[in-house]
Amino acid sequence: MAGTIEVLVAGGQADPGPPLGPELGPTPVDVQAVVNEINDQTEAFDGTEVPVTIDYDDDGSFDIDVGVPPTAALIKDELDFETGSGEPNEEFVADMSAEQLKTVAEQKLPDLLAYDTRNAAKEVAGTCVSLGVTIEGEDARTFNQRLDNGEFDDVFAEAEPAA
């Protein structure tokens, strides 16, 4: 490959302007073709910031690799709020259900070190602490303890590896 460009774009909403245009302009690739391909591959993340890597050759060919959005962005998108709490241990901005936590954990699982959705959910819950988001009406750390104690086995049962 002749080069690599890494950018964050709004899912399904990339355009030839910044940050893509200035990065792609000096390269041999068709900028609009790259933009269209990025939008096709990121439309499921509509509006959420998504990391994208573009590898290109001197002949104008290119490959696009779409990453998973940051955990905080997935949580904000799932719960529909803009910014986390300035005082996350004192002021809470949203409450997440166990089902919503599972949804975010499943989306993020490929990027995490967790080996199943239950453990991915515990990692996502850690981000909830930083954002000031409660889970099932309580602090995310308390939720993780309850999850370890099996209180949410019904929600995460299908995520367990087959025995």
UniProtKB/Swiss-Prot annotation:
Residues 1-25 are annotated as: Disordered. One of its GO terms (cellular component) is large ribosomal subunit. Coiled coil: none annotated. Pfam families: Ribosomal_L11, Ribosomal_L11_N. Keywords: Ribonucleoprotein, Ribosomal protein, RNA-binding, rRNA-binding. InterPro entries: Ribosomal_uL11 (IPR000911), Ribosomal_uL11_C (IPR020783), Ribosomal_uL11_C_sf (IPR036769), Ribosomal_uL11_CS (IPR020785), Ribosomal_uL11_N (IPR020784), Ribosomal_uL11_N_sf (IPR036796). Belongs to the universal ribosomal protein uL11 family. Part of the ribosomal stalk of the 50S ribosomal subunit. Interacts with L10 and the large rRNA to form the base of the stalk. L10 forms an elongated spine to which L12 dimers bind in a sequential fashion forming a multimeric L10(L12)X complex. PANTHER family: 60S RIBOSOMAL PROTEIN L12, LARGE RIBOSOMAL SUBUNIT PROTEIN UL11M. NCBIfam families: PRK01143.1 (NF002232). HAMAP family: Ribosomal_uL11. This is Large ribosomal subunit protein uL11.
